[in-house]
């Protein structure tokens, strides 16, 4: 058994309470202890060990005595306890004295020495520092300038004071009919670089805006915008919207004397920036107007310096870049007269640093005239949003809404022919093969193939190339625009596709919906929806890449099974109007029994071979799929 742990303070208290305490004689120290402090500690430690040994022996003896004398009288036991208690002070007095000396030394020690010891210990745990920089963070998005309580009111009041103006496809005029309203230099540039005839949307806009603009500007150059009001246009793609808003802007700005930022054009993509810039630049030939662009590819510092040194009359940019310039102070909106939103539905769905509120707040800060109608807002889209809350956030003033004379949401060009390819569900896996066969039947075309993702674009292009190598189809020029390519490579592919005029070979560009907006390539003959678009709005933008500028075009829709056919009929076709004398959608694919009864046997004989797969073709097709799988696995490694 182990001895009870010794408590020095308890012994001191017991010795004080004794009536006749014994005189304690401390142990004498040796001379060597007094001379050398270190030797004193050694002897004391040796004495401690001896005393501890004696104590342990005494405890063991006392335990043995207790066991042997368990049957003795109580008086003897009491005498033994008194003797043991009287022996403790003699044994441990030296320990107590040494303990008290240690406490006294600690009180006298310099506090700085203790701190230094702690610092030395902490220094060992210090990690070497590196030259790290703080990660740049985007600016805090400001709250909406519109009170939340007013949002519900705006939803119902967005179209309260809107004047609706209808137009139709028959409204085509000569630009020379507007020679009284258009500057001679501007009219000459239009006829030389664009066309002598107007498109319907151009006709109705020029008829409505030009007389009011010219009259108001002649009366007051400062407040002419109030008589005009804002403009909202819903027009199909390829209908000449860019030229429609460029002509009125240049008609007014061509009369200016000092260059100030008076027109701001906001577009959703960089591709559209270049196309809008080209339109303005061609129209502004022979004038002193300065047209500038701003996009993320350029250095922000260099653009700021350029804008401050030589302020442009017209600036074309994207929402994110615009916010950067507004926050840096390089763009001042004090003299702004025209604000254009091209592809407005996509712009309003984007929230680049809350660009819309940033722009409106900047207008309130910079403009000295805070009255409504201090600028003319022009909103253009092929699928103008029906979300009135988003539109009302732009705070329109006496808006005029220009829409096609139709009860449907959207309108397709008159010369666009649509074909639906009905593919049975059991043959879904052969969809790339059917696409290749369709391409073989189309001669001398330039086709855009739309898929749902970048990965699908990359894999479909690779599989088509492999099938062509295995002689499953004719030789084509097949390229894809996807995220695996660099921006420069994608731009090169698009430019080569646009500039290639070789009509002897089918040119195919596989892409996603990025190419469905803002790509002005007038000679695209065909559009193929390999994956069904998710909405009628997306369908309009895809098909709008062809049949532009009143030219012919074809759109193919690959519909698998009854589900996709029903979706196209109920969610896409129901929202679209077509001209009575224009092209109507037709079925090209495997017909059901009802269609076979209605259609002639001649057309049936033409269609069925497209979807027929013989055993030999099936075997080669499976080899192509295995080759694609091996290629994908190799690229992953």
Curated annotation (Swiss-Prot):
A motif (DEAD box) lies at residues 342-345. Keywords: ATP-binding, Helicase, Hydrolase, Nucleotide-binding, Nucleus, Ribosome biogenesis, RNA-binding, rRNA processing. ATP-binding RNA helicase involved in the biogenesis of 60S ribosomal subunits and is required for the normal formation of 25S and 5.8S rRNAs. InterPro entries: DEAD/DEAH_box_helicase_dom, Helicase_ATP-bd, Helicase_C-like, P-loop_NTPase, RNA-helicase_DEAD-box_CS. Residues 222-402 form the Helicase ATP-binding domain. ATP binds at residues 235-242. A motif (Q motif) lies at residues 198-206. One of its GO terms (cellular component) is nucleolus. Associated with pre-ribosomal particles. Residues 434-608 form the Helicase C-terminal domain. Its EC number is 3.6.4.13. Residues 33-84 have a biased composition (Acidic residues). It holds the Pfam family DEAD. Residues 1-93 are annotated as: Disordered. Belongs to the DEAD box helicase family. DDX51/DBP6 subfamily. GO terms for biological process: maturation of 5.8S rRNA from tricistronic rRNA transcript (SSU-rRNA, 5.8S rRNA, LSU-rRNA); maturation of LSU-rRNA from tricistronic rRNA transcript (SSU-rRNA, 5.8S rRNA, LSU-rRNA). It comes from the Eukaryota. Its main location: nucleus. It catalyses: ATP + H2O = ADP + phosphate + H(+). It is found in: Nucleus, Nucleolus. One of its GO terms (molecular function) is RNA helicase activity. CDD domains: DEADc_DDX51, SF2_C_DEAD. The Q motif is unique to and characteristic of the DEAD box family of RNA helicases and controls ATP binding and hydrolysis. The gene is DBP6. This is ATP-dependent RNA helicase DBP6.
């Amino acid at each position: 058994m182990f001895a009870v742990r010794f408590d020095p303070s308890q012994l001191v208290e017991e010795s004080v309470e004794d009536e006749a305490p014994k005189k304690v004689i401390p142990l004498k120290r040796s001379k060597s202890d007094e001379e050398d402090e270190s030797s004193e500690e050694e002897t004391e430690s040796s004495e401690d060990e001896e005393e501890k040994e004696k104590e342990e022996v005494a405890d063991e003896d006392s335990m043995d005595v207790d066991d042997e004398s368990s049957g003795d009288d109580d008086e003897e036991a009491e005498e033994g306890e008194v003797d043991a208690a009287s022996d403790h002070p003699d044994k441990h007095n030296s320990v107590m004295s040494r303990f008290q000396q240690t406490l006294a030394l600690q009180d006298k020690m310099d506090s700085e020495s203790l701190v230094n010891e702690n610092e030395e210990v902490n220094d060992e745990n210090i990690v070497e520092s590196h030259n790290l920089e703080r990660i740049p963070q985007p600016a805090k998005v400001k709250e909406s300038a519109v009170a939340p309580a007013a949002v519900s009111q705006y939803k119902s009041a967005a179209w309260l004071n809107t004047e609706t103006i209808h137009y139709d496809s028959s409204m085509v005029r000569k630009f020379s009919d507007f020679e009284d309203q258009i500057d001679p230099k501007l009219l000459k540039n239009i006829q030389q670089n664009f066309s002598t005839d107007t498109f319907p949307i151009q006709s109705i806009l020029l008829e409505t805006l030009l007389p009011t603009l010219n009259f108001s500007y002649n009366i007051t150059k400062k407040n002419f915008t109030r008589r005009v009001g804002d403009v909202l246009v819903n027009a199909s793609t390829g209908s000449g919207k860019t030229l429609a808003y460029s002509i009125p802007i240049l008609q007014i700005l061509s009369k200016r004397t000092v260059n100030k930022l008076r027109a701001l054009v906001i577009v959703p993509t960089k591709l559209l920036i270049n196309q809008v810039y080209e339109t303005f630049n061609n129209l502004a030939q022979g004038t002193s107007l300065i047209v500038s662009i701003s996009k993320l590819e350029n250095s922000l510092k260099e653009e700021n310096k350029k804008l401050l040194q030589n302020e442009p009359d017209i600036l074309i940019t994207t929402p994110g870049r615009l916010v950067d310039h507004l926050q840096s102070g390089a763009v001042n909106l004090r003299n702004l007269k025209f604000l254009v939103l091209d592809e407005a539905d996509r712009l309003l769905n984007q929230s680049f640093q809350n660009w819309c509120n940033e722009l409106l707040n900047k207008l309130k800060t910079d403009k000295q005239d805070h009255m409504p109608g201090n600028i003319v807002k022009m909103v253009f889209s092929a699928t103008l949003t029906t979300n009135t809350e988003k539109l009302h956030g732009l705070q329109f003033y006496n808006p005029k809404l220009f829409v096609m004379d139709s009860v449907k949401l959207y309108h397709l060009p008159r010369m666009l022919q649509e074909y639906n390819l009905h593919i049975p569900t059991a043959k879904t896996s052969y969809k790339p093969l059917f696409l290749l066969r369709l391409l073989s039947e189309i001669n001398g075309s330039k086709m855009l193939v739309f898929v749902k993702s970048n990965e699908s674009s990359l894999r479909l292009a690779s599989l088509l190339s492999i099938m062509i190598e295995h002689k499953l189809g004719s030789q084509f020029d097949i390229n894809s625009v996807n995220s695996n390519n660099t921006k420069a490579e994608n731009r090169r592919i698009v430019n080569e596709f646009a500039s290639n005029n070789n009509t002897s070979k089918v040119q195919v560009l596989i892409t996603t919906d990025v190419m469905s907006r803002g790509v002005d390539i007038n000679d695209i003959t065909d559009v193929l929806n390999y994956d069904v678009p998710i909405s009628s709005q997306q369908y309009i933008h895809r098909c709008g890449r062809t049949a532009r500028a009143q030219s012919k075009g074809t759109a193919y829709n690959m519909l698998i099974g009854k589900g996709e056919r029903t979706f196209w009929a109920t969610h896409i076709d129901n929202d679209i109007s077509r001209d009575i004398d224009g092209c109507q959608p037709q079925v090209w694919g495997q017909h059901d029994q009802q269609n076979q009864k209605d259609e002639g046997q001649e057309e049936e004989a033409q269609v069925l071979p497209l979807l027929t797969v013989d055993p030999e073709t099936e075997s080669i097709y499976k080899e192509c799929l295995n080759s694609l799988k091996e290629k994908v696995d190799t690229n992953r490694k």
